[in-house]
Amino acid sequence: MFRKTLIFSLFAILASISASAQHRDILKECIYTPADSARVVRLLAEKAPQGGEVLYYARKFLGVPYVAATLERSKQERLIINLKELDCSTLAETVLALAATKRAGGRRFEDYCHTLMQFRYRGGRPDGYVSRLHYFTWWANSAVKNGLLQHVDGQRKRFSKQLVPNVYYMSANADKYPLLKGRPARIDSIARLEKAENGKPLGYYILQENTGLGRNALPEVRDGDLIGIVTNKKGLDCSHLGFAVWGKDGKLHLLNASSIHKKVVEEPKTLRQYLSEHPSSIGIIVYRLTDNPLKTNRKNMTKVYVMSTCPDCAAVKELAKEDSRFELIDLGEHVRNLKAFLRLRDTHPAFEKVKARGSIGIPCFLSEDGSVSFSLEDYFEKHPDAEPSGEACSLDGKGC
């Protein structure tokens, strides 16, 4: 009985710590204007059609000026929210984050910021320039892994070619990127990520010549689906993004932030015509927002509570950032609650086992199955199927 009461108390304390603190902390990592935050709240309050949220929100940005590289304006990597200037990537992220937040019942600006982070960053939080998902293949893989998007491939006779990325454009052209230029360590990090991800098949796409087919021939593609334009340019995967719109002519069109039109538009020409004017465009890969993106993303997640100053938490933090099954929560700024947490931790039976082995780091793992762990090793003993590497883990900073 004591143990059950203790575990319940532990959950209650940590929940109260994180609920308000997470939202306060998230805004510290954001750059935005009051006008943009107010507009996000207004958009979330609107009655978007259920199932049609993506195209609904995409059309809210028609006419917004096209401006490239708006995420490169801060030397310190933070979540930049800018609804007044968009390029193809920021339009896609902005719209999908609004639609996902709406589907999850989110109403606050902080809810939107949290969702946008899930799309934009490896591990779901900004942690330096390299944490941003710069290539489309990285971005899409992360979104699928986190349950935000699903790949659409339909009948193989239409989705006939597999996209196998071979990206190296950024590391080979670092001088074109202000936040990479003259930063060899950062360039090396990008190059390592490029090498690590290359060769992993992303999914099947529709060849350019089939994009002019009608709705009956391409029933898998729906209004509001995300379209990535696959390119044959060396070192790149996709050259442009937009949203699918079935026109009155029965053909696919593209809603996109256009550098040609200098604003967000629904292209009057068909997607087939659009692609034919860009010889490097060889097809389209299609993704769709999942029905319950944030619920899917947070399903079966283990909360990981750490101290930012904890010297033994390197392995824990690294794991939580890389694996979407973990939600990392920093206790560092909440000393009073931390003291209460430590008192409970020190008397918890599960902690006695860890303490006896000499591992007494701060981390605490709270799983949805109700189990409590105080080290990576202890966590993986309880959840052997979750272990990503099959190796023993510890809190000595050496990782697992």
Task: Describe the function of each predicted region.
Residues 225-293:
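C-terminal soluble interaction/assembly domains
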Residues 300-329:
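Local sequence-structure signature of Cys/Sec-based thiol-disulfide redox active-site neighborhoods
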Residues 326-347:
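Thiol-based oxidoreductase modules, predominantly thioredoxin-like and allied folds used
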Residues 357-361, 372-400:
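Non-globular targeting/processing and membrane-anchoring segments
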Residues 7-16:
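Bacterial N-terminal signal peptides
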Residues 65-201, 250, 255-259:
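Acidic/His-rich structured neighborhood in mature extracellular/periplasmic domains
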Residues 342-371:
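Short, structured active-site "lid" loops
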